[in-house]
A protein has these predicted regions:
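N-terminal leader/targeting and accessory segments in enzymes
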Residues: 1-105
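Nucleotide phosphate-binding/pyrophosphate-handling subdomain across enzymes
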Residues: 3-15, 25-35, 144, 275-379
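Phosphate-binding loop of NTP-binding sites
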Residues: 30-33, 72-75, 84-227, 231-241, ...
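Residue-level signal for inorganic ion chemistry
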Residues: 32, 80, 121, 150, ...
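Short internal beta-strands
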Residues: 38-46, 223-227, 358-359, 378-387
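C-terminal helical cap/extension that packs against the catalytic core
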Residues: 55, 371-429
């Protein structure tokens, strides 16, 4: 009997609840139903707000539905699967643990059961592009790759289709990592900067959650860290296996680095020149960093020729400085992934001229002062919306250099109005970028929906 069969045998008489009846959880729910598990499908939405077909199919398959605002209260189950974005310390989940209920997640169980090598990426910025690059490198090299975590598809439902020679590549958030007790074979941390402080109790809690990606590794694991980032560099004391640094600013002894315009890799001080950074199709110096990160993760698995081929062809990921259209000489870009100041700074640096920027959104209780000097240098018109608009404006106006920089700051009611204002003020040769520096939850369920709406608005001009 294999590990998967043993797992399902161990929970055969357990009641298992899944939080959220969304597209990412449904394959997982049906996997457990098909294995004869007593499943409770839970969602904060009322039945009327959920697709009728989904509700009907779940009931027909034998799932019990627990719906509405109080769906987590007094759950009479043995195991709860929380969603990737659900706070581990949610009072209802704490109460469940106090009552002896097991609280876990798809990724935790997947790591326990996965038969193949795993590569996981976390960080405050650059996770998705780096994860996608790693998967693209490996696929181009000929590996069968399973992409999951925060991107791709749920991997636990397809666990029986994964072979030991495959490679699983996953993106992990701090919310997922905070409770994980198993680390991947290759851990990657892009950087760590203040983020999600509306959910994490302290910055230290956020940092420790990120560090959890590597603390359960063994001597035969690889850890890839950003030596240019003070916090990630500090993680080196917890590395148990091969320590690999990458750097945009300095040469390293073991890892990828930039030497002038040349991307290089030092393998125990033996340096290989890989390519000129100008070979990279993606715009922006932050994407050079993403390549340094991804190369450090796959070195020894992927040939240099494969790396160069991908660099020349890879067009990027949706919502990440994504070109939308050119209208009357004005270029529009969708950078909705910029949910933090550091991410917006990277987006601003990708262009060699001053921009018209659409910013603002949900308040994650992170400071905007670090954004201010870059905004003064790179933004000519800033159109702000959402709960953070005033805080962003205050940080910029109080920054040295604001007086005389010529920046115009405008407040709008919503994204529609922001696009209208940008369209009215932009002149031929201008660049308009949605780069909010904030999460989307004040108006959209996620940054993807915000980005899609922006593209719809721009394409309808």
């Amino acid at each position: 009997m294999n590990k998967v069969d043993l797992f399902f045998k161990s929970i055969k008489n357990k009641k298992v609840a899944f939080c959220g009846i969304g597209k990412s959880n449904l394959p997982l729910i049906y996997k457990f139903l098909n294995r004869g598990i007593d499943v409770y499908a839970c969602d904060r939405r009322d039945e009327s707000a959920i697709d009728e077909v989904t509700v009907s199919e779940l009931k027909s398959a034998g799932a019990k539905l627990l719906l509405g605002a109080d769906y987590l209260k007094n759950l009479d189950v043995d195991i709860i699967f929380r969603t990737p974005g659900m706070n581990y310390f949610l009072p209802e989940l704490c109460a469940a643990r106090d009552n002896g209920i097991v609280v876990t997640s798809e990724m935790e169980v997947f790591f326990d059961l996965c038969p193949c090598n795993t590569i996981a990426v976390t960080g405050s910025d650059g996770k998705t592009t780096t994860t996608t690059l790693i998967a693209t490198f490996l696929r181009e090299q000929g590996f069968k790759v399973h992409l999951g975590g925060n991107i791709g598809t749920p991997l636990l439902p397809i666990i029986e289709d994964i072979n030991e020679d495959d490679i699983a590549v996953v993106e992990l958030s701090s919310f997922q990592l905070i409770s994980m007790r198993k680390s991947p074979d290759i851990s990657v941390v892009t950087n760590v900067a203040p983020n999600h402080l509306d959910v994490h109790k302290t910055m230290d809690e956020y940092i420790e959650a990120k560090k959890n990606i590597l603390v359960h590794q063994n001597a035969f694991s690889r850890t890839v860290l950003n030596i240019d980032n003070e916090i990630t560099k500090s993680f080196e004391n917890d590395v148990r296996g091969e320590k690999v640094f990458f750097s945009y600013n300095n040469k390293v002894n073991n890892g990828a680095f930039l030497d002038g315009d040349m991307i290089c890799y030092a393998d125990k001080n033996v340096v290989t020149e890989i390519m000129n950074k100008k070979e990279i199709k993606l715009p922006g110096e932050h994407n050079v960093e993403n390549y340094l990160t991804a190369i450090s993760a796959v070195w020894g698995l992927v040939d240099v020729d494969t790396i160069v081929k991908v660099a020349r062809e890879f067009g990027g990921v949706e919502h990440r400085i994504e070109f939308v259209r050119e209208l009357n000489g004005v270029k529009y870009y969708n950078d909705s992934i910029a949910t933090s100041p550091t991410r917006t700074i990277a987006g601003l640096k990708a262009f060699n001229k001053k921009l018209i920027v659409l910013g603002g959104g949900y308040d994650k209780h992170i400071p905007f002062e670090p954004l201010a000097p870059y905004a003064i240098e790179k933004i000519k018109i800033l159109i702000l919306t959402g709960p953070t608009a005033s805080a962003i404006e205050k940080a910029i106006r109080e920054c040295d250099g604001f007086d005389g920089c010529g920046m115009e700051i405008i407040h709008s009611e919503n994204l529609e109005q922001s696009v209208e204002i940008a369209h009215r003020l932009a002149k031929s040769g201008d660049i308009v970028s949605l780069s909010p520096a904030c999460a989307s939850f004040d108006a959209y369920p996620n940054f993807e929906e915000r980005g899609k709406h922006f593209k719809q608005l721009v394409n309808s001009l």
